[in-house]
């Protein structure tokens, strides 16, 4: 069975459309491979991360930005003083792709010691 490390070790593949989004069952199976807290709704996955202060929140945001740049797959992020909500979807196909789960796993790895 694939786990978070397997997903985090993968690289995103360019997606410019022309392929169908993941079926709900496929997305649910990939969701099980992520850390707890990720939610599947409305053709996207999201998770809210909490921190002690603004500095830690912004350090996390910058780390997510680095991952996104490396993978060329970018989430929507809503940032507050001590929270950051990260949402992934693949806009080019109007739904979820494996890239969304790969990046979510990489984000999870940022916080695993």
UniProtKB/Swiss-Prot annotation:
The keyword ATP-binding does not apply. One of its GO terms (molecular function) is 4-alpha-hydroxytetrahydrobiopterin dehydratase activity. It catalyses: (4aS,6R)-4a-hydroxy-L-erythro-5,6,7,8-tetrahydrobiopterin = (6R)-L-erythro-6,7-dihydrobiopterin + H2O. It comes from the Bacteria. Disulfide bonds: none annotated. Its EC number is 4.2.1.96. PANTHER family: PTERIN-4-ALPHA-CARBINOLAMINE DEHYDRATASE (PTHR12599:SF0). This is Putative pterin-4-alpha-carbinolamine dehydratase. It comes from Nitrosomonas eutropha (strain DSM 101675 / C91 / Nm57). The lineage of its organism: Bacteria, Pseudomonadati, Pseudomonadota, Betaproteobacteria, Nitrosomonadales.
């Amino acid at each position: 069975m694939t786990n978070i490390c397997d997903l985090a070790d993968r690289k995103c593949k360019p997606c410019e459309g022309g392929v169908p989004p993941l079926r709900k069952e496929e997305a649910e199976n990939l969701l099980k491979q992520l850390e707890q807290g990720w939610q599947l709704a409305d053709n996207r996955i999201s998770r809210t991360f909490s921190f002690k202060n603004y500095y830690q929140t912004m350090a996390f945001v910058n780390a997510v930005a680095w991952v996104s740049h490396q993978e060329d797959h970018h989430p929507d992020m809503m940032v507050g003083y001590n929270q950051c909500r990260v949402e992934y979807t693949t806009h080019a196909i109007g739904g979820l792709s494996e890239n969304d789960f790969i990046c979510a796993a990489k984000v999870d790895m940022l916080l695993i010691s």
